[in-house]
Amino acid sequence: LSVIGLTAGVAWDGYGRYRATTRLVQANEMADRLIAAAGIHAMERGVTSAVLGAVATAGPPFRKQLAELRRSGDHEWRAAIEIARRLAAGRPDDAAFASALARAERSYDVLAAMRLRVDEDLIRRAAAVLFGEWIETITVFIAANARLRELSFRSVELSQDFSQLNLSLRHSLWVISEHAGLERGTLAYYVGARRPLPPEKLDELKSFRGVVDHSIETLL
């Protein structure tokens, strides 16, 4: 009986490690896809900002580029969300992760509605979207998914050192990419509009660049 009990215990421990490893693989894939999606959505933010600032209507090349960015970014995002739903189903007690998942999905719905307004503006120059509205909407969406990515590693049983290293590195890379993207998006709008940067926007750009430079220094 003792041998049987020992064997059962070893088997149970092995199963537990297998489940933890599976969740780790899923969390890593989800995080990688969310990072990829964030980079593509940041490019969408910049291209859209440039066209919103332009005086003329957006031509077919711009609209084609924008459509491709949306398709690519959303493909990565949807794949990540499917993984997130599986992680959430496996951890029904993790309210924070479930809440972050719901917030990410809601923010996508808001972004989708904003894109419809953007499309109308790009074709008709109807002034349907203000630059600030667009930047805020897509930035909130990107940030919501960054939060989901961070919390994904709470839903797996890992050594604390590994989790923290993984999380910190990914977060630093995201901070660099996101603030550089905000810098590019703001510049793109004013270049497209052929308008000088207002003093407050120049201060914003300096702030974005400061965050990027500081984050790079912490990684070196």
Q: Whereabouts are the PLM-identified features?
A:
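Hydrophobic alpha-helical segments
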Residues: L1-L220
